[in-house]
């Protein structure tokens, strides 16, 4: 796997889960002898929703909600076969979305 790079993008609503997952991925990759760049924090996406509380009148009565999507990027440079096997066997938290691309 010479001159290859594995790029891992992580997304989660809870920053504690995503930080724990990135630490686990980085530790696994370093243990198998690969060079790791990151984790790089990407911009957090904030979605805001405004909902009317009253079912009929009272336009001024509203609730506001916010969902934050935290993102991290990890580059694994020159991965070994051990690195790929270890990453495939890795069990991450259920609330973390993982996208892996080879380049």
UniProtKB/Swiss-Prot annotation:
GO terms for biological process: translation. One of its GO terms (molecular function) is structural constituent of ribosome. InterPro entries: Ribosomal_uS10, Ribosomal_uS10_CS, Ribosomal_uS10_dom, Ribosomal_uS10_dom_sf. Keywords: Ribonucleoprotein, Ribosomal protein. SMART domains: Ribosomal_S10. GO terms for cellular component: ribonucleoprotein complex; ribosome. Gene3D superfamilies: Ribosomal protein S10 domain. Pfam families: Ribosomal_S10. Involved in the binding of tRNA to the ribosomes. Part of the 30S ribosomal subunit. Belongs to the universal ribosomal protein uS10 family. This is Small ribosomal subunit protein uS10. It comes from Vibrio campbellii (strain ATCC BAA-1116). The gene is rpsJ.
């Amino acid at each position: 796997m010479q001159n290859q790079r594995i790029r891992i993008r992580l997304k989660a609503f809870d920053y504690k889960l995503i930080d724990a997952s990135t630490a686990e991925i980085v530790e696994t990759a370093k243990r198998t002898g690969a060079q790791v760049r990151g984790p790089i924090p990407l911009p957090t996406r904030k979605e805001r929703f405004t909902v009317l509380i009253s079912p009929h009148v009272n336009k001024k009565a509203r609730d506001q909600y916010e969902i934050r999507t935290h993102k991290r990027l990890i580059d694994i440079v020159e991965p070994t076969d051990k690195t790929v096997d270890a990453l495939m066997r890795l069990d991450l938290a259920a609330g973390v979305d993982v996208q892996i691309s080879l380049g």
